[in-house]
Amino acid sequence: MTDKKVNVPLILLVVAIVVALLVLILFLSLGGKNDDVELTDQVWEGREYLASLEKKDPETVKQIRKELFQQEIQEQLENEREPLLEQLMSGETDPFSLYKDYAILGDSRAVGFWYWGFLEKSRCLSDGGHTIRKIPEWYDKLEEMNPSYIFLCYGLNDCSIGYWDNGEQYAAEYVEYVKELQKRLPDCTIVVSSILPAQDPAFERSKRWRDIPEWNVVLKEACAENGILYADCDRLYEEYPKLWDPDGIHFREAFYPYWSSLLIATALIGGQENAG
């Protein structure tokens, strides 16, 4: 039998055409959805809808497009935040290695950051009995330090001391102190930590500590409304209740890496509900 001569160039040309057609079909089927920012179906449908409205009401469409862009950025932040949090909470990344040029203000609970040797004592402006009304006393010191990050870790004494009748009054005053800090240190990132709850037998000392969850709800809303970063630490109580001291108020040494992880992740990337 006579062997047939194979036309290699022709075969390669056919293969190239087939591949090109497949790529074209794939692109058309995706409809150009593979932008630099990965979009949800909801955002994509919104863009298609806006295209049909743009000629009718351009100003309204312009505002909606801005909101959609912010939603896309929010999704990007969330996608970055979760892997970082996972690395920090698992111990894969040492959270304290990320603390550069900072100041921590707070009460006796915040003292633990330097007491256990995690952070510099000179940068932890905290002591037993302190409330947010101590913040103005640190204004000059903070301006001198000019830190890149400030972490506010108050709430336990604030809730029980009686200066505020409810969470609304407390949150309103808290926001004013943060705004003053922002005015004095415009390049500083400020993070408000949620109030970490107490547990038995602490309630024998103050029944008002049972109101901490309610105060947190109000404080979180106030921060969101005023563009203030809020570190929601509720998960720490749910996941690590045994890391509270026997007094039900303070924390064991092993607690601080978890708390610091949530604080620094919020400062670097934003919270689960980022400030606008």
Predicted features and spans:
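N-terminal secretory targeting modules
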Residues: 1-99, 270-276
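Active-site flanking residues adjacent to catalytic metal/cofactor-binding acidic residues
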Residues: 105-107, 193, 231
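Alpha/beta-hydrolase-fold catalytic nucleophile elbow
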Residues: 153, 193-194
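Charged helix-capping and loop-helix junction motifs
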Residues: 167-177, 209-215
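Hydrophobic positions in alpha-helices of CheY-like receiver
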Residues: 177-181, 223
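A short helix->loop->beta-strand "cap" motif at the edges of active sites that frequently abuts
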Residues: 185-189
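Catalytic His-Asp segment of secreted/periplasmic serine-dependent ester chemistry enzymes
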Residues: 198-276
